[in-house]
Amino acid sequence: MKAVTVRTGDVEAPRESRALPVVLILDRLRSAYNVGNVFRVAEAARVAEIAACGYTACPPHEKLEKTARGCDKLVLCRHFETAADAVAEYRSRGYVIYGVETVEGAQWYWNAEIRFPCALILGNEALGVSEEALSLCDGFISLPTFGCKNSINVGNCAAVVVFECLKRTLV
């Protein structure tokens, strides 16, 4: 059997060299551990930046740092009072705004028409994306769920949608 080399270390690479034209707007996430998970996803896919809104943990934060494993130092993060404030900022910079939520009219992520640059709004673990933020979206993306629960962990959801965006920018 042929030997396989597994990359075990981190690599130095300038962030600005190949940033994915995606911003993640975190709307009132209550778990700093989930926020750290989103930072790991964002760094792996080279997401342009993260907008932490409301009471969402923002670096530096001890619990966030535990799951971010250093990615909080590699991904730009800005704090906004509300998701609506973040939407206004990114829309003024030409971003198309998508709510990642199980709402009527949402397109499953693999069929969704996604225009870049885009901002993806990810909502609170129990409450979802706020009504105010939903009202400001240009479109909606969802992950189908066939079990009893109508959602998956926000960090896992971020991974699925962000890597779908990455795939589309690479093809």
Over which residues does each language-model region extend?
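Post-transcriptional modification and biogenesis factors for structured RNAs
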Residues: M1-V171
